Amino acid sequence: MAAALQTNIRPVKFPATLRALTKQSSPAPFRVRCAAASPGKKRYNITLLPGDGIGPEVISIAKNVLQQAGSLEGLEFSFQEMPVGGAALDLVGVPLPEETVSAAKESDAVLLGAIGGYKWDKNEKHLKPETGLLQLRAGLKVFANLRPATVLPQLVDASTLKREVAEGVDLMVVRELTGGIYFGVPRGIKTNENGEEVGYNTEVYAAHEIDRIARVAFETARKRRGKLCSVDKANVLDASILWRRRVTALAAEYPDVELSHMYVDNAAMQLVRDPKQFDTIVTNNIFGDILSDEASMITGSIGMLPSASLSDSGPGLFEPIHGSAPDIAGQDKANPLATILSAAMLLKYGLGEEKAAKRIEDAVLGALNKGFRTGDIYSAGTKLVGCKEMGEEVLKSVDSHVQASV
């Protein structure tokens, strides 16, 4: 069985302002919760984790967009901002305070900015910002990571692939997040009988772990174009033989979804040769880690890519895939679109509010259609803008809600 990650979350004494925040009331945790609100409106509690580097900048903008799109669709949001990562280390000495975990668990969804920075690189492992993120995922029991990779027509020339290969790419990688070789036991480094050091890890998957990620993938494919490719290494690995067997058996419950199988080495090649053949990909932890990063580069900029991590019943964790970019933090240079699109995923996959999610997605396309670009996606003939102005343009498009061309 996959070993559980030790959280080592410690209670800390917050400054008065943060203690006041943690006293806000929230409903008991379960998937897609809705508290009482104004007549005709639904209310959701959202925990915001700005984190480090450019995180606070992009979270501030995404919050405004989320609030505006929600209000236009009859939704009300109550936001609670909590520290995590390096910001929490500086504030209270640990990367994930117990109060942050409690707030996240009691919310309907969690929106994260970014984690990490040079400042904390030399910290011991348990005091690194990234440890806080791993602990948060473990605390929320998220097991399914959804990462879309879409080449928008406005940005097709930013892709490293030829236009005819990149144009029209729209795929989703569904990665199992808590099992496999990253968590399997036994693991370690030891000295063998010859006195030589040996490092070893174990790829382990139980049937229920495969079944639950496969269900997420089938449901995701059903909402997209109805095609699911399961990626494994069943010609070599026993764990992959079981993976393929379980996914194939589950396909009987989804006759409307076309299932195919592909070995991971071939999948890695096909992603750059003909990425348009893929709709939804489901795979294990380590293969998903690699393939999702590969797929992200097809789009041309990680500043455009959101992600969602889902659990069986509790709140999901939504975040851009880019890092904290401390070298541009506070300079109004960050691209907020990945975080804005993460807010759209929060609405769609976390709360089931697809109309509000579509409003945000259309607004992003609307701003791009008008030619606005941050530095990472800028090209000749477009208008270079900063983080704040890009956010303002998306907000304008949310208000107008003109169906954007794709």
Swiss-Prot record:
EC number(s) stated in the UniProt entry for this protein: 1.1.1.85
Keyword terms, alphabetized: Amino-acid biosynthesis, Branched-chain amino acid biosynthesis, Chloroplast, Leucine biosynthesis, Magnesium, Manganese, Metal-binding, NAD, Oxidoreductase, Phosphoprotein, Plastid, Transit peptide
Catalytic activity: (2R,3S)-3-isopropylmalate + NAD(+) = 4-methyl-2-oxopentanoate + CO2 + NADH
First-level EC class: oxidoreductase
Site feature Important for catalysis, where: 182, 233
Keyword NAD in annotation: yes
SMART domains referenced in this protein's UniProt entry, alphabetically: Iso_dh
Protein role: Catalyzes the oxidation of 3-carboxy-2-hydroxy-4-methylpentanoate (3-isopropylmalate) to 3-carboxy-4-methyl-2-oxopentanoate. The product decarboxylates to 4-methyl-2 oxopentanoate.
Protein name per its UniProtKB record: 3-isopropylmalate dehydrogenase, chloroplastic
Source organism phylogeny: Eukaryota, Viridiplantae, Streptophyta, Embryophyta, Tracheophyta
